[in-house]
Amino acid sequence: MENLHGALERQNIAYFSMEIGLRSEISTYAGGLGGLAGDVIRSAADLNIPLVAVTLVSNKGYFRQILDPEGNQTEHADEWDPSRFMTLCEEEVKVKIQNRDVKLRAWTYTYKSHIEGCVPIIFLDTNVEGNESEDRKITDFLYGGDQRYRLKQEIVLGIGGVRMLNALGFKVRKYHMNEGHSSLLALELLKQNSLDPNKVKELCIFTTHTPVEAGHDKFDYGLVGDLIQDKNDVEILRKYGGQNYFDTSIFAMNLSNYINGVTKRHSQISSALYSGYKIHAITNGVHSYTWTSPYFRKLYDRYLPDWENEPELAS
């Protein structure tokens, strides 16, 4: 595709995140995880890092809170139209869910740095003609529905995301999983690499943000088997993701060469929660230019030239 031409020429790092916050009109974020993902993308563009990001289109958003006349809080869909901001790709791929072929298409949005670089973001969409009605809704809501809905989304993000990058022609040398939602990408990579875990580990990086056990996705193998159905795949998930239930974080950690938490303290808590894994600490940051008001930008421009390239000058 013409709008991806420059990105396809480079060896890319693929950054997978269930939510990404890029602009308020594109409601594919719920909170901090999406905000941080957006800032990673912005910083990568500033530094001209060859990154491509993958997420779900979530065209009905997370939810929008409204107070009714009685003062009660109510939630409503936060719908947006991808065609206003993005380009629809011609390529389609398929994933198996309950032994059905579910077709995926992709929208592309390119974030352009105020300096020089850019990062393409791939938004996966199951609202494709020919899919069953329930399958067309998989990418409607961010974190919507129950465990079944969530696991379907994670199949689309992880397995479908890898397949879409291949279909679009990206040459990926590293896969970065931002939380366990995308961990099923490692299953797809295992199958592409003769089930060799060492080859997959060399390809994968995992970042965990969640300091409590309840925050990590876990799925009963009855549900996993019902949706994935391939017995060999389910056995792979048991081998690397836990025997009693499928823990997406354990699966990601067992198949990653590098694991990090998001502060020193958080890495210590995560190491205690998941003993036996070396969890490094990379402190969360923000893309300072984005979150600095125009008034302060002018002030910094006057007294701290080039602060947008070296934000530590403002500290």
Residue spans of the language-model regions?
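Catalytic cores of carbohydrate-active enzymes across secretory and cytosolic contexts
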Residues: 1-315
